Amino acid sequence: MVVTLKPRNILFIEPGQKAARWLLPDNDHIMSDSSDIREAATNGNAQRMIATAVLVKSTTGSPESVSGKLLLFDPSGRTIVEVANNGRNIHLTSLSGGDLTILYERNRRLVLTAFDPGSLAKRGEQEIDVPQPK
């Protein structure tokens, strides 16, 4: 039997700051899914972190069947955006064409949401109808 432990919170520590900050106000949740969004490496330079998307779910119930809160935050944790309050899974994150995009499941539908990669301001959201296979 394999047991996978999921993180419950993220601690942000910044050089020169005396106090650290937690992403969440408590440890009563798990981060069932996460995805780092990075800028492509150029000329041998390391990839630069743009943001992280995490799906935060209650510790009660099965993480696979419970919906949760989808958050997007910058590397310092100072800018935190609530993307959705009833997300199920993060399917894809990407940075292309000047947009940071997240494809996730909400209410048994796929949702594609675009953000500005600098400010994390929402630029648009589109629900995608997925037909049942025959």
Could you say what each language-model-derived stretch is?
Residues 1-12, 47-64, 97-105:
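Short beta-strand elements that form the blades of beta-propeller/WD-repeat-like
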Residues 5-34, 65-86, 111-130:
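Surface-exposed loop/turn elements that mediate protein-protein interactions on large endomembrane-trafficking
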Residues 28-49, 86-103, 129-134:
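Conserved beta-propeller blade repeats
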Residues 37-46, 53-61, 67-69, 82:
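Short secondary-structure capping micro-motifs at structural edges
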Residues 57-58, 68-76, 94, 104:
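Mature extracytoplasmic/lumenal regions of exported proteins
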